[in-house]
């Protein structure tokens, strides 16, 4: 809808309609969910910039991040994207929340568990298919995930992230359609595990700010 036209509330019976708020699902693991304060920063940045007709959705309530924000999300600590794809659980969450846009930063635990890159990409494809089954016009923003410090995670983790991220653009191009775009969001470049994480894996405030900025740059053209 047009945020400048308060006289048109839209059809309340059509949550996915063009006049209702844009429903955005943050999807992933603990980097997204616990505490995942990049979501709070992103919400604040979007609303400060005038994008107020938005609704973050998910089955999880978020943690406190120091200021009010729309905290609902699907960031599940410890989750492997390969396990979620196999379980079919995403379909239940989609039915309950009806997102228009998904922000997916997913695969860190898979890399740590030595899942091959192609296996992770196949899981991404399964999730995208489930998303489209619920909303044929779903927009999927897929992160090239933040780096991991092998000294503080697993010996193969740093290279595993590089391998996954190198493969994501080609995968996204093969999955994307005009009706349901799959957009790559680079969360890796410029992210430093030394200064932007507290443990070599999870973002600190500096890392959260970078993640929020990258999502913001990808989201605003979709919301204009």
PLM ranges: what are they?
Residues 20-24, 49-55, 97-103, 134-141, ...:
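Loop/turn elements at helix/coil->beta-strand transitions in domains of secreted/extracellular proteins
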Residues 147-186, 205-209:
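Substrate-gating cap/lid alpha-helix
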Residues 27, 196-224:
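Histidine-centered active-site loop/cap adjacent to the catalytic His
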Residues 1-19:
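Ser/Thr-rich, Pro/Gly/Ala-heavy low-complexity intrinsically disordered linkers and tails
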């Amino acid at each position: 809808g047009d945020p400048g036209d308060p006289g048109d509330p839209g059809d309340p019976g059509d949550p996915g309609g063009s006049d209702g708020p844009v429903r955005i699902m943050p999807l992933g693991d603990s980097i997204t969910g616990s505490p995942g304060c990049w979501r709070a920063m992103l919400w604040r940045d979007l609303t400060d910039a005038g994008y107020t007709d938005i609704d973050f959705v998910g089955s999880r309530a978020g943690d406190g991040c120091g200021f009010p924000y729309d905290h609902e999300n699907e960031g599940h600590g410890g989750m492997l994207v390969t396990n979620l794809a196999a379980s079919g659980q995403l379909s239940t969450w989609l039915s309950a929340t009806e997102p228009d846009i998904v922000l997916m930063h997913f695969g860190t635990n898979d890399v740590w568990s030595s899942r091959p890159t192609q296996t992770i990409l196949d899981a991404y494809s399964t999730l995208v298919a489930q998303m489209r089954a619920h909303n044929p016009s779903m927009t999927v923003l897929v992160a090239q995930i933040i780096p991991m410090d092998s000294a503080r995670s697993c010996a193969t983790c740093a290279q595993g992230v590089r391998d996954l991220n190198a493969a994501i653009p080609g995968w996204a191009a093969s999955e994307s359609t005009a009706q349901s775009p799959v957009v790559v969001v680079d969360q890796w470049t410029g992210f430093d595990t030394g200064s932007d994480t507290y443990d070599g894996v999870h973002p600190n405030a500096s890392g959260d700010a970078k993640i929020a900025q990258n999502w913001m740059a990808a989201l605003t053209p979709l919301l204009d």
